[in-house]
């Protein structure tokens, strides 16, 4: 099995329960075909570099998985048919870091800075 990071950009109108349901559907595909979810991160609501389908902001989700080609095809089909997902990207990696991603580290720093000035 190869290692991949899957980054999803999801419509901003979705609630946290709908986002959880979406990620559960994807992780069930992974586990049903003997893949493994190694890491899951919710990067929060972020501004897009440019408008995508009239959206200026969206939810970002990252799934680090161990999967074969069959699982990738199943995930790609599911993502393609899901209207809630604006964009997705599979990235093949050599190893998956167990530490918090830099995006989350920067986000928590910004939130702390905002809380201090309030």
Curated annotation (Swiss-Prot):
Annotated Gene Ontology cellular component terms: cytosolic small ribosomal subunit
Pfam family, one: Ribosomal_S6
Record-linked InterPro entries: Ribosomal_bS6, Ribosomal_bS6_sf, Ribosomal_S6_plastid/chlpt, Transl_elong_EF1B/ribsomal_bS6
Any one GO BP annotation for this protein: translation
Domain of life: Bacteria
Position of the signal peptide: none
Any GO MF annotation of the entry: small ribosomal subunit rRNA binding
Keywords, ordered alphabetically: Ribonucleoprotein, Ribosomal protein, RNA-binding, rRNA-binding
Family named by the database record: Belongs to the bacterial ribosomal protein bS6 family.
HAMAP family the UniProt entry points to: Ribosomal_bS6
Function: Binds together with bS18 to 16S ribosomal RNA.
Protein name, UniProt field: Small ribosomal subunit protein bS6
């Amino acid at each position: 099995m190869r290692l991949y990071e899957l980054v999803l950009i999801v419509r901003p109108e979705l609630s946290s329960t709908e986002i959880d349901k979406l990620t559960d559907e994807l992780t069930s595909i992974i586990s049903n075909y003997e893949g493994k979810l190694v890491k899951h991160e919710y990067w929060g609501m972020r501004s897009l570099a440019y408008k995508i389908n009239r959206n200026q902001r969206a939810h970002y989700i990252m799934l680090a998985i161990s999967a074969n080609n069959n699982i990738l095809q199943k995930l790609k089909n599911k993502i393609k048919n899901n209207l809630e997902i604006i964009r997705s990207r599979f990235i093949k990696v050599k190893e998956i870091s167990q530490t918090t991603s830099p995006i989350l580290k920067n986000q928590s720093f910004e939130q702390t800075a905002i809380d201090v000035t309030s």
